[in-house]
């Protein structure tokens, strides 16, 4: 079925018809994970270009994908680093697509939603959610020097 409008899917399990991709370019390597860096979002950027070009993205709701997660990725330090780099990636994509102010406003809105959600959760879960949002914001609002 078509992927819901207004959302961009993740790229963990995707397939394309090569002929249908002409004119959209490939994945932007500056947004990919290279040399241990956790910058990401090349698939989000690519999906965004497809949607802007009028393409429909399809998905299989019942598909199952298994992840093997090494212990090093289950630490608080990794979680903070990953969350920070999610913010950096969001900023890079917002700069590419010239929507940085809109992305900043959206992040502030997400803070409001996060605080409301935290009021409904056990304190331990709330702390993890707040850590994630804080690190994403730090990455998003920090200008990266090239």
Regions found by a protein language model. Name each.
Residues 1-2, 24, 75:
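General structural signal for secondary-structure boundaries
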């Amino acid at each position: 079925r078509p992927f819901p409008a207004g959302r961009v899917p993740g790229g963990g399990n995707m397939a394309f018809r090569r002929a249908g991709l002409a004119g959209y370019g490939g994945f932007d390597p500056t947004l990919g994970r290279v040399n241990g860096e956790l910058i990401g979002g090349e698939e989000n950027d690519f999906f965004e270009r497809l949607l802007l070009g009028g393409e429909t993205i399809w998905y299989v709701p019942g598909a199952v994908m298994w992840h093997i997660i090494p212990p090093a990725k289950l630490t608080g330090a990794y979680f903070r680093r990953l969350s920070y780099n999610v913010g950096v990636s969001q900023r890079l994509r917002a700069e590419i697509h010239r929507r940085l102010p809109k992305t900043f406003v959206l992040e502030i809105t997400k803070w409001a939603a996060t605080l409301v959600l935290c009021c409904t959760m056990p304190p331990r879960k709330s702390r993890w959610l707040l850590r994630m949002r804080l690190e994403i914001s730090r990455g998003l609002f920090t200008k990266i020097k090239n």
